[in-house]
Every structure is written in C-alpha cells, then in structure tokens.
A protein has these predicted regions:
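Terminal, compositionally biased segments used for targeting/anchoring and flexible tails
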Residues: 2-228
C-alpha cells in the first residue's frame, strides 16, 4: 500500500484500446464487462505476501491472537455496499447531512450507526460538470467497511494503470459514456486516505424515500465506473 499523497487527474488520452488478446486482464470474449481472472489463478503479489507476513508477526509478538485476527477478517469479509448506499441516500435527502459527509465521511457514517473504520474517507461528488472515479494505483486500498470487498477488476494491474491515463476509455468499457463537456477526475487512494463517490441523484426520484433511494445505489457507482 502507498503512503504517498493522493492526487487527482483531470485529463485523458483521446484514443481507444481494443482488448482482443486473451492475456489482457480486461479481455472478455463476450465484449460486455471487463474480465479479471480469479486471484487464485495468479501468483501472490508483493502486498499479499507482506500482509500474511505482518499478520504472522503480530500473532507471534502477542499484539493480537489468531482468533482476533480471524474475527477482524471475517468482519471485513461480511461487509457489503449496503452501508455505503445508506450514506448516499441520506446525503441525497438531507442537505445538512450531505455537508457533513463532504467534510468527514467517517463521522457522518457513524451518525447512521455505521462503523467505517479509522482510515479517513473523503467524499467526492458527481455533478453536471464533474465525474469522479476511484483507483488505487499501487494495490487495492478501498473503503471496505463502507462498501464491502473490492471487485477483482479494481485490483487488476490493467485497471490500476490505465484509468489514470485514459479514464474515458476505461469508463466506456464499463458502458459509461462521459460527455466531453464533463471533467473526469481520477482519485488515487492510499494507505492513509480512501475515497467514496457520491453519485449524481437520478432524475425523477424526488418523491422516493431513503430506503428506495438506497436500493438504486450500486457499488460501481460509488467507485465511479458507472452512473445511475
């Protein structure tokens, strides 16, 4: 994981990449959604080896027990995007809550009884002028306690390297067409800071309650690769 400062990118390269090579991590013979091999099909990466080593060291030094470490892993594995969708729905319907989300996601989430963890999470809002998308260029930093485990494609080398340099092309591969008049900003998550996209509220939802609004929000829209 990275401890370098986060940075945003508002540019893209105006060219497309065809993914016709079966060795490409985003290759999909059906041409629908980016395909990423199961992690079991690929060798352990450096951060995975380090994570196991750190876990073993913490147990050996008595900082945590194996049961405590296992319980934390199970807690993280049990999380789903549902927690994040509640935050988004409340932000759409309560301007004061939205202001608190924009100031401090962690504190705002706790108001709803959600434990977002201790790592700071910053909200970035999609508007008629700006579209945001999240990546972790070095590994897979991600607000797991708020929106669940990261999808395999988020961890893929192809997504991590390409979305920074050609965001519109990558978004198009998810079926997301962003007008040239809209600025695309790419936010690089780090070990010290995570991001949450607040999707643009769909038109025609003014009369919906929070529960129904939350059902409209998807994991991918909170990452920024799709819109609602």
């Amino acid at each position: 994981m990275s401890d370098t400062p986060s940075h945003d990118h508002g540019h893209d390269h105006n060219h497309t990449h065809e993914h016709n090579n079966p060795d490409d991590p985003l290759y999909n013979p059906h041409g629908e959604h980016p395909y990423q091999p199961d992690s079991e099909d690929t060798p352990y990466e450096h951060h995975q080896v380090m994570a196991e080593a750190v876990g073993e060291l913490l147990i050996e030094k008595g900082v945590v027990t194996a049961d405590e470490l296992r319980a934390m892993i199970e807690l993280i594995d049990s999380k789903s995007p549902a927690e994040g969708t509640r935050v988004i729905a409340r932000a759409w319907t309560d301007p004061q809550f939205k202001a608190r989300v924009m100031e401090n996601v962690n504190d705002a989430a706790e108001e709803l009884g959600i434990d977002p963890g201790t790592i700071p999470i910053r909200a970035v809002e999609n508007t008629k002028d700006v579209h945001n998308v999240i990546v972790c260029t070095l590994c897979s930093c991600y607000p797991r306690l708020l929106i669940g485990l990261p999808p395999d494609w988020y961890k893929s080398r192809s997504y991590r390297s390409r979305v920074v340099h050609e965001p519109r092309t990558v978004l198009k591969e998810f079926g997301t067409e962003i007008s040239e008049e809209i600025e695309v900003r790419v936010h690089d998550s780090t070990a010290d800071l995570r991001y949450l996209v607040i999707p643009k509220r769909p038109d025609g939802t003014e009369g919906m309650n929070e529960e129904d609004l939350a059902a409209l929000v998807t994991r991918d829209s909170m990452i920024g690769v799709t819109t609602l």
